[in-house]
Swiss-Prot record:
Short name of any one Pfam family annotated for the protein: Oxidored_q4
Membrane-spanning residues: 7-27, 63-83, 88-108
Organism in which the protein naturally occurs: Burkholderia vietnamiensis (strain G4 / LMG 22486)
Enzyme Commission code: 7.1.1.-
Protein name per Swiss-Prot or TrEMBL: NADH-quinone oxidoreductase subunit A
Reaction catalyzed: a quinone + NADH + 5 H(+)(in) = a quinol + NAD(+) + 4 H(+)(out)
Keyword Glycoprotein: no
Highest taxon in the source lineage: Bacteria
Family statement drawn from the similarity comment of this UniProt entry: Belongs to the complex I subunit 3 family.
Subunit structure, as described in the record: NDH-1 is composed of 14 different subunits. Subunits NuoA, H, J, K, L, M, N constitute the membrane sector of the complex.
InterPro entries: NAD(P)H_OxRDtase_bac/plastid (IPR023043), NADH_UbQ/plastoQ_OxRdtase_su3 (IPR000440), NDAH_ubi_oxred_su3_sf (IPR038430)
Length: 119
């Protein structure tokens, strides 16, 4: 196996990492360091923090986040499928239609069970 083809990638990684470390270090060394009470206080939308940061969230926020991830992954699978559709032909098309039908049925189930209602 010829590893010489990977030397430009290794050089790119080393230069990028070295440059990043150098710039952060220069900023730490030359930048002003004057901490005070206001700079060290927790920031909450321009207001003083009025509650503990560890408060309970409604479980529906987590449900919406999980549903977003699921349907976002579905669209992530759609893009390469669309690019390769000419090469994969009818078997690939039918497999993706079955995949989309499963997600559509899942979406209908979530909707019917009230997973998207905020009442």
């Amino acid at each position: 196996m010829n590893l010489a083809a990977y030397y430009p990638v290794l050089l790119f990684l080393l230069v990028g990492t070295g440059l990043g470390i150098a710039l952060v270090s220069i900023g730490k060394l030359l930048g002003p360091n004057k901490p005070d009470v206001d700079k060290n206080a927790p920031y909450e939308c321009g207001f003083e923090a009025f509650e503990d940061a560890r408060m309970k969230f409604d479980v529906r926020y987590y449900l919406v986040a999980i549903l977003f991830i699921i349907f976002d992954l579905e669209t992530a699978f759609l893009f390469p499928w669309g690019v390769a559709l000419r090469d994969i032909g009818w078997p690939g098309f039918s497999a993706m239609m079955i995949f989309l039908l499963e997600f559509l049925l899942g979406f209908a189930y979530i909707w019917k069970k009230g997973g998207l209602d905020w009442e």
